[in-house]
């Protein structure tokens, strides 16, 4: 997401309509064909599973319960092979039990236990198996830190090949997730609007209210000393013009959404889109925020735009961040993803 207002071309409606109004969007449109739920041994796994299953049920996508078994940090030597095999079998049994308990809700669940460094293995496994949505918690086995994300979550998000559903560790734990309000930030760009078919499909599946939000920035004027009266008037005229255009834009988006959905629009005046959206999330208390990884700027050298990155590091509600494969990592990961993974010895050395 970027913090700019709609372009003149968008004022006139001269761009492709991204919204499918039938409410029966296919996975070809939503682009989430396979889901992986990252499940560690912490209690936060109880937060990940319901959200992964809610997505799988709404999208008709298979879901994999994925666990990575890591050697304990700081050992300085390889663990005993027998002890390691026991850990692997225990992990397989635990994940299989979790899947068995939830197959009545979503039948198409499989499980996978892999070995190695968590973030690296999750990224490579997702790439090799065509995962397009990775569901994970902001923190995991290492516990809650003073930072917005745990180290593993940060690495997985930065290296992910597809979209991310990030669950804050402080969010409520529930056996079944119901999204009553879905907030969608829009900056007027086609990139931001590309999430609309998915948001609409989720709203239909969950009978949720959609809240479309646009932040109107305060235009910057070059200042050398106090602003003259003409400059103050000019800035106010620009703000009023931008608010008018944004109102018309949100009204057009709302009018094209399928009948049968509850839709609200929210227009905020603020100097910064990041803090404006943060305030909207705090006040509206949505159950889910759906946004594009990039908005108008769509810089290819970073995995997320400034707004998405800010919301990730200040997540207080679940964030569904829709993104394509990060091009700045493509060559490196394609070269390393299929290397033979290191294995523990089968006998003492």
Feature names for model-found ranges:
Residues 64-66, 110-114, 165, 211-213, ...:
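General small-molecule cofactor/ligand-binding pocket signal
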Residues 153-172:
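Short, structured interface segments
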């Amino acid at each position: 997401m970027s913090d700019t207002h709609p372009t003149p071309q968008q004022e006139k409606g001269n761009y492709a309509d991204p919204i499918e109004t039938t409410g029966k969007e296919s996975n070809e449109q939503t682009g989430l064909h396979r889901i992986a739920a990252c499940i560690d041994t912490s209690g936060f796994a109880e937060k990940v599973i319901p959200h992964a299953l809610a997505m799988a049920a709404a999208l008709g996508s298979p879901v994999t319960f994925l666990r990575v078994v890591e050697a304990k940090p700081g050992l300085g030597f390889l663990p005993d092979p027998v002890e390691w095999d026991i850990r692997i079998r225990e992990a397989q049994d635990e994940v299989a039990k979790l899947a068995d308990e939830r197959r009545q809700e979503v039948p198409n669940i499989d499980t996978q236990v892999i070995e190695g460094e968590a973030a690296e293995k999750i990224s490579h496994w997702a790439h090799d198996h065509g995962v397009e949505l990775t569901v994970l918690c902001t923190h995991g086995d290492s516990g809650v830190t003073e930072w917005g994300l745990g180290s593993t979550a940060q690495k997985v998000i930065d290296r992910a090949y597809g979209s991310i559903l990030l669950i804050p560790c402080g969010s409520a734990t529930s056996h079944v997730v119901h999204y009553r309000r879905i907030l969608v930030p829009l900056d007027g760009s086609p990139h931001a609007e590309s999430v609309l078919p998915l948001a609409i499909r989720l709203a239909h599946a969950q009978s949720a209210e959609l809240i479309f939000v646009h932040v109107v920035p305060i235009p910057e004027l070059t200042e050398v000393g106090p602003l003259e009266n003409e400059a103050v008037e000019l800035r106010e005229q620009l703000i009023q013009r931008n608010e008018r255009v944004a109102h018309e834009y949100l009204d057009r988006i709302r009018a094209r959404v399928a009948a049968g959905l509850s839709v609200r629009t929210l227009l905020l005046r603020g100097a910064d889109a990041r803090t404006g959206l943060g305030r909207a999330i705090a006040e509206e208390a949505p159950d889910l925020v759906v946004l594009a990884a990039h908005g108008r700027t769509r810089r290819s050298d970073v995995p997320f735009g400034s707004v998405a990155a800010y919301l990730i590091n200040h997540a207080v509600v679940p964030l569904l961040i829709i993104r394509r494969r990060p091009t700045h990592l493509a060559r490196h990961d394609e070269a390393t993803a299929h290397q033979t993974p290191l294995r523990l010895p089968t006998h003492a050395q």
